Amino acid sequence: IPFAGRYRMVDFVLSSMANCGISNVSVVVRKNYHSLMDHLGTGREWDMARRHGGLNIVPPFAEKGVRIYSGRVEALSSILSFLEVQKERYVVMSDANIAINYDFNALLAAHQASGADVTVAYQKVEIPEGRKNDNYTLTVDADGRVTELLFNDYRPGKQNLDLDIYVMERQT
């Protein structure tokens, strides 16, 4: 998504990842991605132009017999063989439609300390009366564990909105 002329929303996430020392990034694309490929180029803008790791753009149909995906789980499934050959211990997933300067290192540390299978980043936000929430809303217990996940929640007041940023340990 274009932002302020020459930038795109993906630039915020990539810059945050680069600033946290993440040097192996794969952008999983679905459709109409030619201009995105032109924009990202080799990844040099984020110091990710490398022979090993760096910035990878993973188009749909990269694997034989894989159909275009419709959600995050299908996207991961479609790149499973790609993920299996990576050497990094953790996978950080983030949508690229958010203007954010995010500390992925803090999220990774929280994930490691929690012992959870998946750690999700969320933000407490005030939802006005009558406004439909198009994000996932999380209910968390006293230990910070997600106990409920709602979509299109209509409840007003303070809500925990999913930022669509996740971290998990890769199974080897």
Please describe what each predicted stretch is:
Residues 1-172:
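Unchanged
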